[in-house]
């Protein structure tokens, strides 16, 4: 049973754990030295980044002394970077319950195979996760290439933290893919149970009872899946809402920096960097929202399968089992919330885009007003100087 339950983890999150260990987000072992190394790496990276940032020994793309609005946005981006990196790593080191989540999901997968007669293959979830891994590696490489190409000290200094953000959010995307796979297997198992109920509707009660017992097993498996999702929420309780806020700040500010770089006529490499990072982060947000919406659709499909059963509805035992199952399915709906503040789905994605676009328009409008006021003040000062000059 332990070997069977390990198949799901090997097909999905095994390589992500190794990547996170290589990045210093997770310790290589459970001993004190391994955890201490992660703490030292975190504080050294954030300390060096903060010290170098506030030394101001680098080039600005805006008027740092006079453009208060741009400097405020710049400082907000840096604070979000440092706090987000610290929250993600500290949450992983202090409250890492990933083994509990993996154990629950693997146990559910084994129960579906053994009790509901589904296939023993994990090829589908492996294919889903390979797509996510491939996307992560490609985005990492593109991000590193455009960072080197732009050759700006500010972007190079933030590279390690940005890689940590992408890895943590991709871990959440992998879990969404695993849950989608389990829902698909659960629907196949539910169809097998319904087919068995139809085939045995004229059989003896002893045979019929075995089929009805599978409804109770199906109900227990769904309850275990619902509890595993709640445990997964606890695993991402702080980091997920932090990542969403960080990505919202970045995706809203990056178009503003693109606009400002075109106005200030900075290097084209900087504009390419800003546009590329914007696309990378938008893609990172879209995929898990789509997967969560698919899981919700699978949940509704699973409910409709048993809500519309018409086979042998004169049986009081079958009616009682179906009522109990439908009541549970209507209450234990699929819903993944980020820190209890927002549900992850395409509806949230639409609100995210609307807020992002609104924030971009506001930032650009502030910049236009600031530049117009600055030009007006300069022109006024020139006029005063010219009129006060001696004749």
From Swiss-Prot:
Q: Which UniProt keywords apply?
A: Cell membrane, Glycoprotein, Membrane, Receptor, Transducer, Transmembrane, Transmembrane helix
Could you list the residue ranges that cross the membrane?
Answer: 32-52, 75-95, 129-149, 174-194, 240-260, 273-293, 348-368
- Entry's localization field: Cell membrane
Residue ranges in the Extracellular topological domain are 53-74, 150-173, 261-272, 369-391
Instruction: Spell out the InterPro entries in the cross-references.
Output: 7TM_chemorcpt (IPR013604)
* One term under GO cellular component: neuronal cell body
Topology Cytoplasmic: residue spans: 1-31, 96-128, 195-239, 294-347
Enumerate the GO terms in the molecular function aspect.
ligand-gated monoatomic ion channel activity
Name of the protein: Putative gustatory receptor 98a
Name the species this protein comes from: Drosophila melanogaster (Fruit fly)
Gene from which this protein is expressed:
Gr98a
């Amino acid at each position: 049973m332990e070997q069977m339950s390990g198949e799901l983890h090997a097909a999905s999150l095994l390589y992500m754990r190794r990547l996170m260990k290589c990045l210093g987000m997770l310790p290589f072992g459970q001993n004190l030295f391994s955890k201490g190394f992660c703490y030292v790496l975190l504080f050294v990276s954030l300390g060096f980044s903060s010290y170098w940032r506030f030394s101001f020994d680098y080039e600005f793309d805006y008027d740092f002394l006079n453009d208060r609005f741009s400097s405020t946005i710049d400082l907000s981006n840096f604070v979000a970077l440092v706090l987000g990196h610290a929250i993600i790593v500290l949450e992983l080191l202090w409250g890492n319950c990933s083994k509990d989540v993996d154990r629950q999901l693997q146990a559910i997968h084994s129960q579906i195979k053994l009790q509901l007669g589904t296939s023993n293959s994990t090829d589908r979830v492996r294919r889903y996760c390979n797509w996510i891994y491939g996307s992560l590696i490609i985005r990492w490489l593109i991000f590193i290439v455009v960072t080197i190409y732009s050759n700006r000290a500010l972007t190079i200094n933030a590279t390690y933290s940005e890689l940590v953000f992408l890895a943590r959010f991709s871990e959440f995307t992998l879990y969404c893919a695993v849950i989608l796979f389990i829902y698909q297997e659960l629907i196949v198992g539910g169809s097998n149970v319904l087919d068995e109920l139809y085939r045995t509707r004229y059989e003896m009660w002893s045979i019929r009872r075995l089929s009805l017992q599978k409804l109770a097993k199906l109900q227990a498996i769904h309850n275990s899946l619902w509890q595993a999702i709640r445990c997964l929420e606890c695993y991402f309780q702080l980091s997920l809402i932090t990542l969403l806020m960080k990505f919202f700040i970045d995706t809203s500010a990056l178009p503003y920096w693109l606009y400002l770089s075109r106005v200030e006529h900075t290097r084209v490499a900087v504009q390419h960097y800003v546009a590329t990072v914007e696309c990378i982060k938008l893609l990172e947000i879209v995929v898990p929202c789509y997967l969560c919406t698919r899981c919700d659709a699978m949940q509704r499909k699973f409910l409709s399968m048993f809500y519309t059963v018409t086979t042998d509805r004169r049986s009081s035992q079958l009616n009682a089992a179906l009522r109990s199952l439908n009541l549970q399915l209507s209450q234990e709906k699929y819903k993944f919330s980020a820190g209890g503040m927002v549900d992850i789905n395409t509806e949230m994605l639409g609100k995210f885009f609307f807020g992002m676009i609104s924030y971009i328009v506001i930032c650009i409008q502030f910049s236009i007003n600031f530049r117009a006021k600055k030009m007006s003040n300069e022109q006024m000062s020139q006029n005063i100087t010219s009129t006060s000059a001696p004749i």
